Regions:
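Active-site loop/turn elements of alpha/beta-hydrolase fold enzymes
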Residues: 22, 66-68, 164
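A short alpha/beta connector and helix-capping loop motif
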Residues: 13, 31-66
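Short amphipathic alpha-helical segments
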Residues: 30-32, 75-76, 147-150
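Acidic-leg catalytic submotif of subtilisin-like serine proteases
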Residues: 16-26
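Early exported N-terminus immediately downstream of N-terminal targeting peptides
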Residues: 60-61, 65-83
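Short acidic/His/Gly/Ser-rich catalytic and metal-binding motifs that mark active-site loops
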Residues: 25-29, 71-73
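Active-site-adjacent betaalpha module
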Residues: 1-16, 49-57, 80-206
Length: 206
């Protein structure tokens, strides 16, 4: 009998919160009213709560942003070139939104493709940190978030997606993406996950 399961609670010393692409570029590039409203009203407040809970529990808080290594974008993936996704190195578009700005010494990975694990060395760094489980939040649910979930799972991480700390351009696309990746991850609301982190953090200190 297979007793392995994805339903493993967060173990703070071996976990990281990964916040994907919540940056100035994604605000300016979007024309979706649903996306902008859900980001402002739901995602950002919930990401802030996750940051607070994770920092308090000693869980690494890590960010990814879309950002070229060059000013002219010649290093971008072919897909990003075709799609017109161009965030020059050092530009304001590459900055994490002020509402959830990284704290001192929190890591920001700069990527040039939809897949964080393909175009950065994050897997190497996570293994150096002893991370075995990832809490994933950010944008877009059906694009960069989904890509990260699938690859993280294939690389051997236990993944929890925070369903009300992610969004995309429509409710339908958000729900379809969550349905499609259900076999790769746990899915929790921010309320449930913050409570879980609090309990497990307390248990660690007892």
């Amino acid at each position: 009998m297979n007793r392995l399961s994805r339903e493993v609670p967060i173990d703070p010393p071996h976990a990281a919160l990964l916040i994907i692409d919540v940056q100035n570029y994604c605000i300016g590039a979007s024309t979706s009213e649903y996306f902008l409203r859900s980001l402002r009203d739901t995602v950002l407040p919930n990401v802030r709560r996750l940051q607070f809970a994770c920092r308090g529990a000693g869980i690494e808080v890590i960010y990814s942003v879309i950002e070229n290594m060059t000013r002219d974008g010649r290093d971008r993936s072919l897909d990003y070139k075709i799609s017109g996704i161009d965030v020059p190195r050092g530009s304001s578009d590459a900055q994490v939104l002020d509402e959830i700005a990284p704290a001192e010494d929190e890591m920001v990975f700069r990527k040039t493709s939809s897949n964080l694990f393909i175009s950065t060395n994050i897997d190497y760094v996570l293994r150096n940190l002893g991370v075995r489980s990832l809490i994933i939040a950010g944008i877009m649910t059906d694009q960069c978030v989904e890509s990260a979930v699938r690859d993280a799972c294939d690389l051997g991480y236990l993944v929890t997606v925070v369903i009300d700390a992610c969004t995309t351009t429509s409710a339908e696309r958000h729900e379809q993406s969550l349905l499609g990746i259900r076999g790769y991850c746990r899915q929790r609301t921010s309320d449930v996950l913050v409570a879980e982190i609090s309990v497990n953090s307390s248990n660690q200190s007892d």
